Amino acid sequence: MPASHPHQHLVNHPPIMINLTENSEHPEYNTTQVDYLRSDKPFVVIHFIQECGRKLEADSLTICTAASLFHKFSASASLSHYCPYLMSATCLYLAGKVEDNHLKLRDVINVVHSVLHRSLEPLPLGDQYWNTRDAIVQAELFLLRVCQFSVRFSHPHKYLLHYLKSLKDWMAAEVWTKYPIARTSWAMLHDLYHDPLVVTADPSTVALACTQLALETFGIQVPFVASDTWWQVMDEKVSKDKMWEIMTRIMEVYSKESEMIDSLAIK
């Protein structure tokens, strides 16, 4: 890899927010307990959505749709006027409907309460529970209006799955076996949902950027083609500049993780 490459410093630097497992589409995330109530920054709220989604055993697309809904809401409404954690619970509940992965509202309320208030007992069926339930139902209608009832997203997942299968056939079997290219690509995609760019970026380009950055992480070059053009075989319309932009944003996510999340860790 040329010394002037903009992402050379990432070689041999694995993702820091996740522990990669055999299930590539569902990486095992950092289990550090976070005191979310100390921050209302969107990055932290997305981290909260992802933790709650995993505890609800929601599927990958549901969690990513919930994150996308929050980004879309944040782009149109002032977060200072709304409780971000009420809206994140609402995003999860609505995302379950959008992706046909229905989440019981009672489960959403209980999980959100337990993650926000880790030292408290589960929320009893009293006034606080029913008030929270009513608030989420009303917030769901508000969220739909803010999003102009456009709540479906073209996620990069199907593109990434296709590109990884193609790349596996392209590369030497021993390289694919030795390095967790697929798992790292999936992890980077999931982590990119901390950034609102994922809502507006071309999903094919996002998928290719995650794959390219995973290759660079392990210092791997695709054979029989220039290392910086292999993705054009997959999608000829992809812009190199856009690829670099997305790869840079992925790395910024990992920088923000230590800045915003680690500082909120419960000791």
Write out the residue ranges for each language-model feature.
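C-terminal functional regions that serve as terminal interaction/effector modules
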Residues: 1-20, 200, 205-267
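A eukaryotic "domain-start" boundary segment
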Residues: 1-61
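Structured all-alpha helical bundle cores of eukaryotic regulatory proteins
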Residues: 39-208, 212-241
